[in-house]
């Protein structure tokens, strides 16, 4: 039985390591992650994790783990910004308000597809021009849902979180361990 991580995220590899796991292979799926017209955040995350799990090639007996983290303000999904201008717009929108971070995970075996969605809430402070310019200069906003990663330099902008910190980073530990154990992967095996 091999554990296949369907993600190119180094954070997800790190979180698996905290659980005592090392993926046997890393196979990021190539799917269209654009939201459908009028698609709400939770159904979007559910659709994406299922599509990712189905897109990862696997052999009989393999266990595939995929995840997706989405930032949402109300009904609006904030994906990965296309450029610096969009990242600035996202961070301006998020500044001074609470928003949701939804991380979905899917574990696929030969005969089952198990999913969970973990919703956390965070509040980002309003950024000054100096903070915004400084953060943009780091480039850390690139490739990140909502234009930030809470475990990076942007972590200084969040005075409040409610929920799972590991889910906000990209992989909820409790739910990941539970689903992998249900799939036959032993967590903390020595």
From Swiss-Prot:
Primary site of residence: cytoplasm
Catalytic activity of the protein: a ribonucleoside 5'-triphosphate + H2O = a ribonucleoside 5'-phosphate + diphosphate + H(+); a 2'-deoxyribonucleoside 5'-triphosphate + H2O = a 2'-deoxyribonucleoside 5'-phosphate + diphosphate + H(+)
Keywords: Cytoplasm, Hydrolase, Nucleotide metabolism
EC number(s) given by UniProt: 3.6.1.9
Entry superkingdom: Bacteria
Transmembrane spans: none
Cofactor list: a divalent metal cation
Keyword Ribosomal protein among record annotations: no
A GO cellular-component term linked to this record: cytoplasm
Family: Belongs to the Maf family.
Protein name: Nucleoside triphosphate pyrophosphatase 2
Source species: Jannaschia sp. (strain CCS1)
Taxon lineage: Bacteria, Pseudomonadati, Pseudomonadota, Alphaproteobacteria, Rhodobacterales
């Amino acid at each position: 039985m091999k554990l296949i991580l369907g993600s190119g995220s180094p954070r997800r590899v790190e979180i698996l390591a905290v659980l005592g796991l090392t993926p046997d292979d890393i196979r990021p799926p190539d799917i269209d992650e654009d939201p459908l017209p009028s698609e709400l955040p939770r159904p979007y995350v559910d659709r994406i994790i299922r599509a990712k799990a189905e897109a990862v090639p696997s052999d009989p007996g393999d266990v595939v783990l995929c995840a997706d983290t989405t930032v949402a303000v109300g009904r609006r999904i904030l994906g990965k910004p296309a450029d610096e201008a969009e990242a600035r717009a996202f961070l301006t929108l998020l500044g001074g308000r609470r928003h949701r971070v939804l991380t979905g995970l899917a574990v696929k075996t030969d005969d089952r597809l198990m999913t969970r969605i973990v919703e956390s809430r965070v509040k980002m402070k309003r950024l000054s021009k100096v903070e915004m310019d400084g953060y943009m200069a780091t480039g850390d906003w690139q490739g990140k849902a909502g234009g930030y990663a809470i475990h990076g330099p942007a972590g200084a902008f969040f005075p409040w979180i409610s929920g799972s910190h590991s889910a906000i980073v990209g992989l909820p530990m409790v739910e990941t361990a539970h689903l992998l154990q249900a799939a036959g992967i032993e967590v903390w095996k020595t």
